[in-house]
Amino acid sequence: MIRKLILPALLLIAGSAQAGDEAGHAHASDADSHLATLGDIRLVHAWTRATDRGEALVFMEIEHNGHKAATLTGGASGIADGVNLVAFRSRDGNAGYVTLPDLTIAPGTEMVLQPEGVALRLTGLDEPLVEDQSFDMEVAFDLGHAQVIVQIEAPNATRHSHAGHAH
């Protein structure tokens, strides 16, 4: 019985190790769906809120450990018509998100995409986002693209349910 379980486990580990960076695209590993990498850039805890509306905001931590600036330009997802970089702004009593063309992240810094801050906005959602499910999303940088797994949290969530532990 144990022998029957070991072979599939080894095949899963080998497949995950081969999934590395191909043609400028990085993929989240099966063993750690909360982390994706693109060279010296780490994307941690991608999440959004459950919604039945046509758009949603995606949040995450972006750690840039490289020596050259990286520019976040947007993204793509099979569940949405578009993915735009946005920032929260409150002016003259009006609050909301405005589109940003891109965002440069300095080497050795961390950028936190969070509610009422900077986020990636999914527009034209094909279907509702259901709590405790997840979906794939590509995050685009000038240096390449990283594939993240976005966890869908409660409609009123203010952070990822696993935020605060190390990866």
Residue map of PLM features:
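Compact, glycine-rich, soluble single-domain proteins
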Residues: 20-167
